[in-house]
Amino acid sequence: MRVRFFCEIDFYIVRGELSLIIKDVDTQFTVGDIAAKREELIRKLLEKGVDKINKRLEVPLVPLRLGIISSSQAAGYIDALKQFEESGIGFHITLCDVNVQGEAAASQIVAAIQTFSRRSDIDIVMIMRGGGSKGDLAVFDDESMALAISRCKHPVFTGIGHEIDT
């Protein structure tokens, strides 16, 4: 990730000290890079038709056996779990507790998708996390994750973001 700082350089002659004082951060600089990479990935996946593969799978009329990929602490998961419980419908939830941000997140999510794909006791797979900064959510702009979703033997639904993302 690239970051642009607006700085002031200060030199204190008496002690021979050089200071770099950060005055501001150009957040649009990094956001522009993230957006460009995301658009390129989307274009590449659309060209391959990856976006349509998982959509062809039949969704059960009432999917009761839910394979959920999320952090057990994610706001989106906690809210969804509350809704499932309050619905009075007999959902059977299997959670695959993963990191939903950071270096390990994409590979953990891909592994969880592959694990649920091999299971016959799952009706649908759901990937969930709460909101966050565009940088935090960028982990989901991952080609290996998109390919894993397209290859999953169960329909995959996503719930990414929560209230207002920053």
Regions found by a protein language model. Give the residues of each.
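Short, small/acidic-rich helices and loops at N termini and domain boundaries
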Residues: 1-5
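Short, glycine/charged-enriched hinge/interface segments at domain edges or termini
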Residues: 6-96
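Short glycine/threonine-rich loop/turn motifs
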Residues: 67-166
